UniProtKB/Swiss-Prot annotation:
Annotated positions binding substrate: Y110
Entry-linked Pfam families: PseudoU_synth_1
Catalytic residues (UniProt): D52 (nucleophile)
EC annotation from Swiss-Prot or TrEMBL: 5.4.99.12
Originating species: Aquifex aeolicus (strain VF5)
Subunit: Homodimer.
Keywords: Isomerase, tRNA processing
Top-rank EC class of the record's enzyme: isomerase
Name of the featured protein: tRNA pseudouridine synthase A
Length: 241
């Protein structure tokens, strides 16, 4: 049975995340609807991860199997002709039958954008967290570096099921082109809300609203994250295969 990989991007503003939910607009739902229309059969799409409502993706991996052997370029053109304007597929590739978007991924890179100004930027507002108080970026950089390495991130996620919460956060970097602040995080996988809670906690500590003792407890898997950064600043930037 032919197995196809999709690479796509989407603006998450008007979506209730990736995963299909009854009576709600989701990215998975839109893609399955488009593929079913093109292929004239029910299609189930597997995504590389969940995304929360309002979160964006610059690079998202999905796959699906079909009864039909469809030319890649023809399928790419057909998909982009049907999908809504806030979703774009930029690559379609036939892969081995064993490929699974959820389990074949080797890592992910997330980007979080902060607009650090009292004046709203209307072009970045849907894609960033506006923080009006001035952030000391050197303090923020030092705090973020403490998240690097292997830690128990239990206190920085929402535990919906029993799973391993010890993760090696390979890289956390900060890029400042003031007032735009960009935070990148790389790991083999992430827990739900993990990136948003790392960013939210680091920003609140750098603003002096929480002590660094809170951070030490969180990195030992104790307590609960004091703040979750809003979803619109979060972008899945790269999926590593």
């Amino acid at each position: 049975m032919p197995n196809y990989l999709l690479r796509l991007a989407f603006v998450g503003t008007n979506f209730y995340g990736w995963q299909v939910q009854p009576n709600l607009r989701t990215v998975q739902g839109e893609i399955q609807k488009a593929l079913s229309q093109i292929l004239c059969e029910d299609v189930k799409v597997t995504g590389c991860c969940r995304t929360d409502s309002g979160v964006h993706a610059l690079d998202y991996i999905a796959n699906f199997k079909t009864q039909k052997d469809f030319p890649e370029e023809k399928l790419l053109k057909a998909l982009n002709g049907i999908l809504p304007k806030d979703v774009g597929v930029y690559a379609v590739k036939k892969v081995s039958e064993e490929f699974n978007a959820r389990y074949s991924v080797k890592g992910k890179v997330y980007l979080y954008k902060i607009w650090n100004s009292e004046v709203r930027n209307p072009f970045l507002y849907p894609f960033s967290w506006q923080v009006k108080r001035e952030i000391n970026t050197e303090v923020l950089r030092n705090i973020l570096k403490k998240f690097e390495g292997t830690h128990d991130f239990r206190a920085l996620t929402k535990l919906e099921e029993e799973r391993n919460t010890v993760i090696n956060l390979e890289e956390v970097s900060l890029n400042v082109e003031y007032p735009l602040i960009e935070i990148r995080l790389k790991a083999s996988h992430f827990l739900r809300y993990m990136v948003r809670r790392i960013v939210g906690t680091a920003v609140k500590i750098s603003l002096g609203l929480y002590s660094e003792e809170v951070l030490e407890e969180l990195l030992q898997g104790k307590g609960n994250s004091p703040y979750t950064a809003p979803p619109q600043g979060l972008h899945l930037e790269k999926v590593l295969l």
